[in-house]
């Protein structure tokens, strides 16, 4: 396993005391798995006080099919004129790979593939094939804005296949149109943060940590003591502000009101429920997604061509 994947201090620095946009069940799996690696003996839900237990990790699904052209020059498949961009696993700020890699996808890779597809003459539209519980806040909003920017160049659709939660929902909201499968899990428009406290464990081992610092907030949220009330309030305010920013983005992209988005209270929706909540547009079988998008693009092209022909005919008649 590479150093990048086993750099536990780096992983911990991104997982703790940082806002995350994760589907709740996946968050439990994630932190329970990470706890075993970091020697954390107990995980507690700060809201309910319950201990967290791990469930089953999500399984990635992806569309498959023949590429319209040679793949070596592209970082995505082109199927019937549609660039298919897989977005699976945990979403992180950046990775070394453009494609999903070792259970995660980098926002930097999504942006790079979007920009390449937007300028590809063989691509008429872009489909984000998504199976993600969400991930890091860092980079998510910028990535969503790029999706919204690219959709003004070429249609960008999102397919929840079979999960599209939290940060994934943010990205999907920025798309021109959102498809969901009948069992797809979507929504979870909220933010969370975890704080770790190693103080008791270190004391049992006879280890005492002394923090020497300058600046009253320099060691806020440090993992060697309980979280003080005032620091927790500050972190809670940060979560609330990020959640509101999340809701504002979804509102701007989808046309839903900010209050309607906030009123979801980070609920997770399944299939048709997402359409009823205004977070998705159409229920499809994942194997039909390419055909559905292709038919829509052809119909749009036909309408535009018909409109141009009508104007040209009128112009000729007037002349």
Language model: regions and residue ranges:
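N-terminal organellar transit peptides
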Residues: 1-319
